[in-house]
Amino acid sequence: MSVKQTVQVGDKIIRRKATLVHDVSNSEIQTTIRDLVDSMRHDNLVGMAAPQIGRKWRIFVSEVRKTTYRKNIAEPDLLRVFINPRITWKSKKSQSGYEGCGSVAAAQLFGVVKRAESVICNALGKD
């Protein structure tokens, strides 16, 4: 297990455009994926992007599951890895809900965020 410290808002890497991944099998990419999963789970998050652990790559992971702050998850989602993600469609209908962010020092700080109700995202997987 390799838990990385979460980069906080204000660090330049959070705002910088991430780099496309050209070789998914590259050992640095595979290590980044493992570190993201370990860090996300350790910090009780349901998603995390590579820049949040100081890596420049266009990679994020998600796993909706019970956490310290999400206790009422009826059906946990599978772990998903997205490499070079690109949203190709989003619904016109939106929904709002409370979200937190691991890159905000106050982990218990949540705010209402409005998002599309559904999206289609094209991405590579970890394999």
Q: Where in the sequence are the language-model features?
A:
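Positively charged
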Residues: 1-127
